[in-house]
């Protein structure tokens, strides 16, 4: 039978397909019956066989928790496997040889730094700590100040002996402590890398603890302060036992040690002592109580110096003979700069940036000694210290004009150090003659080396590649080359092929003008004149005063290693302080231990932008 497909094709009724559909339907019905019968069979079986027993899970009771035994075994196994793996790795790490990169040997500047700091241990007065590390030194000067009847100063134990004698001159001692503090503030990372940070801070504190005894540091104002302990007067044939007539170990001193005070013109001494205390307060800023004590003392003594105008050395013959101060205006700027950094009080900045202050200090004079930084003249150091403020904080009006002047003058000083300009003569061996051929030149050259290196680091930190000398531009590397040339000369790169730092290298001075180093520690007490035989002996000193930088050669690079010729062989606190500062500034460059610390010195300085105005009063209708 045929029909027609409505889409155009034939439409057949296929009987075969129809039959197949019937068969398929019957098969499906059979499957359904089979599916229904299977659970019935299982049910019947359960009646006959009984219920199937379920397999019980096993657990482990750990006391605080119950866990599956399977999980417990898996966890323990994992931990054991991890422990075995860790042990295996540890065994490999410990047994397999490791190849460490070799630590570069310390450079000469770092080696010399260790020794130069040790000199201060040898110069300590008072009851020495057990770790002083100078075997031939002992307690000394324990009666200092105690014999002064009617005096406020009953305890002046401590501090440092100035040079080869046992006098404590507070003016150069304060300068030495300021230099040590300045070097720590700028280069604490280098001290830390050299393992000397704790040591140098202990040396500074030894000095500042003593300074706090030299005036009434707990008062709000003072009328005098100590300038000197001990005497060296041998004028007019004076034979009274004192620190210059006698030649004795400091430990054996039995003569009177007079105390000299200053109650008239003390501006230079007071301002320098303020600089020492203020700079040290930054070094010890983490010790809040001690730092606060130092700041208070610095304020009191600086104000005293401003009130009692005059040179401290004008009133005493000994001070004018040994450490004569040429003026006090440079100390006013130097001390005032440190007071500003230590306190953040803008009053100090206003004071030291007055043009008249700079004029009195000789900032515009020039002259043959302009740029010579020393225990006497602090102007070059003060100008660099204030150039730092302009470079990194740029305080602007009203300080910019005078700070720019200080900065320009600092650049001129740096130009004067370069050999191309012939401002200062040099020996044939290359030593700069900042004191124009006078004796004891090394103390001035190390100071110049420090200032040059520090200015170079300031410029580098300010992303400034150099500076101008007239129309010519010079890289900061030129300053470091100058500094290295001076320190290398002192360490042995000179015509005599000898080191002027005792204990550095194999050839160095053996007849140092120093009482303690020249007399053996042999349980024999040599009296005032009994020690003369050691003073006049031609034999080398029995004790090595390690790290002492002697006065130095003459203008012809000549050197006489004669104990009694102090112009060649005597070391000083001020000289060694400059040496330490220059050495740490140049040290560690191969190990990349960092350069200056830009921020620590500004810890107490507040923001220099104007205070914003107060908010307006609340609006009311």
Swiss-Prot record:
GO terms for cellular component: cell plate; early endosome; endosome; Golgi apparatus; plasma membrane; trans-Golgi network. GO terms for molecular function: cellulase activity. Belongs to the glycosyl hydrolase 9 (cellulase E) family. It comes from Arabidopsis thaliana (Mouse-ear cress). Glycans are attached at residues 108, 133, 216, 324, 345, 408, 425, 567. Residues 59-62 are annotated as: Polarized targeting signal 2 (PTS2). It is a single-pass type II membrane protein. Residues 1-70 are cytoplasmic. The keyword Lipid metabolism does not apply. Gene3D superfamilies: 1.50.10.10. SUPFAM superfamilies: Six-hairpin glycosidases. Its EC number is 3.2.1.4. The chain crosses the membrane at residues 71-91. This is Endoglucanase 25. Changing residue 344 to R: In rsw2-4; decrease in cellulose production.
